[in-house]
Amino acid sequence: MFGQRLDTLGAMSSSVSSPSPETGKKILLAAPRGYCAGVDRAVETVERALEEYGAPIYVRKEIVHNRYVVDTLAEKGVIFVEEASEAPEGAHMVFSAHGVSPAVKEEAAAKNLQAIDAACPLVTKVHNEVKRFDKQGFHILFIGHEGHEEVEGTMGHSLDRTHLVDGIESIPGLPAFLADEPNLIWLSQTTLSVDETMEIVRELKKVYPQLQDPPSDDICYATQNRQVAVKAIAERCDLMIVVGSTNSSNSVRLVEVALQAGAKNAYLVDYAHQIDEAWLDGVQTIGISSGASVPEILVTGVLERLAGYGFDDVEEVTTAAEKIVFALPRVLRPAR
């Protein structure tokens, strides 16, 4: 297993390195970064399914939001489809780490698909909260990004009582009756910016003073701790490079967090070759992080490319240690 839990350390630690005396150029490497426990579980689920059942294995949507991971699995015999109905009758299908709605599971059952759910357990936790609060008669204000697979899957568990809040600007468009609704609670997508989410909550409470907080935070440990790690180095950086795909919510948020925390510039790249040499003009210190669905090999590629431009002194700045591991879906666990 590869995923690990993040427990904030009492003091930030770093590997000590001095800028090159010749160039003064330096890289600050944020830690933790990259794969989280939920992504580890999802990718290993697909790999184990290939070993157990052979190709092809069908996956609804992208198993995780990373181009390299998807392309690598496709080369091994994974077929990615938009909907369960696109898979042939009786095929093996894996649901992505982002979770699915009951309607998707019903669609898979109608085609007798051998479904394996690779949803991150932290996403499943939010699904269970939605179902519980729906059953208790609450209306739910769900903070998230419209069209994101996690949002669609989560809201599918309470179609009539869950209302999407996609940014502060969407608040005026919420149903008018919610102003008089006594049982009102907010929940959120797991991969949002912590600061942005709480800003939205503050605005919601101005409109809905009765709005209740959830019993626990929905933004996942990996998302939060990667943001903390970026904040720890951003102010020292002339440039921040985040490795991740444009459809990865948590990766995009890291770019935003870096800029808000003081980085002079920040870019998102899938691969090292996407780094534009012009970005490096006048730059002495570069910060590097990666989203929760990014394998470390892609970060290594970025470090190697930057070394070619004289950025060969690397200081890893660690703000937390990761120890969490999620078990595979039961059907793929080794027999005891």
From Swiss-Prot:
Catalytic activity, EC: 1.17.7.4
Keywords noted in UniProt: 4Fe-4S, Iron, Iron-sulfur, Isoprene biosynthesis, Metal-binding, Oxidoreductase
One function term, GO molecular function aspect: 4-hydroxy-3-methylbut-2-enyl diphosphate reductase activity
InterPro entries cross-referenced by the UniProt entry: LytB/IspH (IPR003451)
CDD domains registered for this protein in UniProt: lytB_ispH
Pfam families: LYTB
Record's signal peptide: none
Annotated catalysed reactions: isopentenyl diphosphate + 2 oxidized [2Fe-2S]-[ferredoxin] + H2O = (2E)-4-hydroxy-3-methylbut-2-enyl diphosphate + 2 reduced [2Fe-2S]-[ferredoxin] + 2 H(+); dimethylallyl diphosphate + 2 oxidized [2Fe-2S]-[ferredoxin] + H2O = (2E)-4-hydroxy-3-methylbut-2-enyl diphosphate + 2 reduced [2Fe-2S]-[ferredoxin] + 2 H(+)
Binding site for isopentenyl diphosphate: H65, H98, H148, S248, S249, N250, S293
GO biological process: dimethylallyl diphosphate biosynthetic process; isopentenyl diphosphate biosynthetic process, methylerythritol 4-phosphate pathway; terpenoid biosynthetic process
Active-site annotation: E150 (proton donor)
Cofactor note: Binds 1 [4Fe-4S] cluster per subunit.
Enzyme class (EC, first level): oxidoreductase
Entry-linked NCBIfam families: ispH_lytB (TIGR00216), PRK01045.1-3 (NF002189), PRK01045.1-4 (NF002190)
Role played: Catalyzes the conversion of 1-hydroxy-2-methyl-2-(E)-butenyl 4-diphosphate (HMBPP) into a mixture of isopentenyl diphosphate (IPP) and dimethylallyl diphosphate (DMAPP). Acts in the terminal step of the DOXP/MEP pathway for isoprenoid precursor biosynthesis.
Protein name, per record: 4-hydroxy-3-methylbut-2-enyl diphosphate reductase
Organism: Corynebacterium efficiens (strain DSM 44549 / YS-314 / AJ 12310 / JCM 11189 / NBRC 100395)
Gene giving rise to this polypeptide: ispH
